[in-house]
Design a protein with these regions (language model features):
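Amphipathic, small/basic residue-rich leader segments at the start of a protein or domain
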Residues: 1-93, 113, 117, 340-347, ...
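Glycine-rich cofactor-pocket loops
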Residues: 3-4, 30-41, 252-274, 287-320, ...
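Glycine-rich beta->alpha junctions and the first turn(s) of the following alpha-helix
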Residues: 3-7, 11-12, 212-325, 441, ...
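N-terminal glycine-rich flavin-associated loop
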Residues: 90-116, 140-143
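A short, Trp-centered hydrophobic/proline-enriched beta-strand micro-motif
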Residues: 125-140
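A structural signal for short hydrophobic beta-strand segments in well-ordered beta-sheet cores
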Residues: 156-159
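A short core secondary-structure module
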Residues: 168-212
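Glycine-rich phosphate/cofactor-binding loops in nucleotide/flavin-utilizing enzymes
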Residues: 383-389, 412, 418-472
Length: 472
């Protein structure tokens, strides 16, 4: 690992703590109350504030116009901000789920186009936020596994027409849908065999035939809207097709089903460690709240912090934070050596990207990204050259981190409420909000049950020839 990454990560943590002090902590409970009073509230002011801080370009690689901070540092940032408010962190973090979807496709031309719009939005003060749409009314976790998607009730269909596709269907629970400028959308040519006909698109908000329904009245992370996206005879031209069997065949002979799974794995292997970091941030926030309460509250003339049962619970909570942090660090380490951003962290490449001035990327590198050869090369590097064991390592560790970190976060919130008693149930104490926020983390990015099965599939089953996964 390049040594400068450590310095860079410390810088990111310092920025996150400053943001917490100035924005997240003062607003967390206020915005939560506001969303209960006004269920149609959309966080435009928060999005604009995050844009002013540069958060929507911070982890976009410099070749695409972004600031180019190392990707693992985002997990540290996520932990910090989520310790104050997981919903606010999702307003920032879900944008990078779509960024991962763009880059993992290997479609350099389209990734450059969209990501440079994000950069332009930062400069102009008009945020260009991205969303990613996979979940459907009858298919959620199913769509993240090729072995399961054919069993789901898939309805979002892409029909081939001259010069593009017509999209019909609905996506649900799409984080930041209502406030996004572009959506990375996955649809299927044959809804009976979706695993072999996956197509990725980018759709601009306002496109004819694309509209928003309601956004969910959620239990937690209320400041981050979860939207219904409706597509009714929505035409998407060929130049906005991100991923398809036709594009895949240009750089690999592997079956489309396998390539689609590898594409999905690249995305979630990069983002699930971040969800773990969200969970550990909430776990840490709950620990800090319980510690403060125990240090300042007397029972029968004796500080709560001096009672052994409280000391044991606080030690357990602290242990949970440490273990979760190790889990997302290990998952990020796997990605750094074998996953989506491995090339960016090879020492010569990393220092080259740091040393080159902005104009070099704008004048020299940016035009190269429009070449078809560049997209073919990226496709080859992502989909044809990596070994299956690399994919299993990254995907397996990402799943372990995801379910470990989020489960530990739930435990810490429950323990904090036990320590704080009735005080922990009060809205102004903040811990009941943390418990509402953390529950969602066990569900999105693949339920924790699915992630346990994926961890078994990737890390255990290869050593047991008779083991079968997703066979029921």
């Amino acid at each position: 690992m390049p040594k400068h990454m450590v310095k860079e990560t410390r810088e990111v943590i310092a920025i996150a703590r400053k943001f917490n002090d100035e924005v997240a902590k003062p607003l967390a409970l206020k915005l939560d109350r506001l969303t209960h009073e006004d269920v149609d509230y959309l966080p435009w002011e928060l999005v604009e504030e995050a844009n002013r801080w540069g958060f929507y370009t911070m982890w976009i690689p410099k070749m695409f116009g972004g600031q180019g901070y190392n990707i693992p540092s985002m997990s540290c940032f996520s932990e910090e901000v989520a310790s104050a408010c997981a919903g606010m962190m999702n307003v920032i973090g879900v944008h990078y789920l779509a960024v991962a979807g763009l880059i993992a496709s290997g479609n350099a031309r389209l990734a450059k186009r969209i990501l440079r719009e994000v950069v332009a939005g930062e400069k102009s003060g008009k945020p260009c936020v991205l969303a990613l749409a996979t979940t459907e009314p009858g298919a959620g976790t199913d769509v993240e596994e090729s072995d399961l998607v054919d069993k789901g009730r898939i309805t979002c269909q892409a029909t081939r027409v001259e010069n593009g596709y017509i999209i019909n269907g609905t996506k649900v629970f799409i984080s930041m849908g209502h406030v996004s400028s572009w959506t990375v959308l996955y649809a299927y040519e044959d809804t009976r065999h979706p695993s072999e006909t996956t197509i990725g698109f980018v759709v601009k908000t306002g496109t004819k035939g694309f509209s928003f329904g309601s956004h969910e009245n959620k239990m937690g992370q209320r400041v981050c809207p979860a939207s219904v996206l409706i597509f009714e005879d929505c035409f998407i031209p060929d130049n906005l097709v991100l991923f398809s069997s036709g594009l895949v065949k240009k750089f690999t002979k592997s079956p489309v089903r396998d390539i689609a799974q590898r594409y999905i794995d690249y995305v979630v292997s990069a983002t699930r460690p971040g969800v773990c970091a969200f969970g550990i941030g909430v776990a840490r926030g709950a620990f800090e709240a319980a510690l403060h309460y125990a240090s300042s509250t007397e029972i029968n003339g004796r500080l709560l912090i001096n009672q052994e049962w409280v000391q044991c619970m606080l030690a357990e909570m602290h242990k949970n934070v440490i273990l979760g942090r190790l889990a997302y660090t290990e998952a990020n380490n796997a990605n750094s050596h074998r996953g989506l951003y491995r090339l960016l962290q090879i020492k010569p490449v990393y220092y080259y990207l740091k040393a080159m001035p902005r104009f070099w990327f704008d004048k020299v590198i940016a035009p190269v990204l429009d070449w078809e050869f560049t997209s073919r090369l990226m496709g080859k590097l992502y989909f044809d050259l990596p070994k299956p064991e690399d994919q299993r390592c990254c995907s397996g560790w990402a799943s372990v981190a995801k379910f470990a970190g989020t489960d530990l976060g739930v435990k810490n919130c429950q323990m904090a409420i036990e320590i704080m008693g009735q005080k922990g149930l009060r809205q102004d104490a903040g811990v009941e909000k943390m418990l509402r926020d953390i529950k969602l983390l066990q569900i999105y990015e693949g339920t924790n049950q699915l992630n346990r099965l994926n961890a078994f599939k990737c890390l255990i089953a290869p050593e047991v020839p008779q083991a079968k996964v997703f066979d029921e």
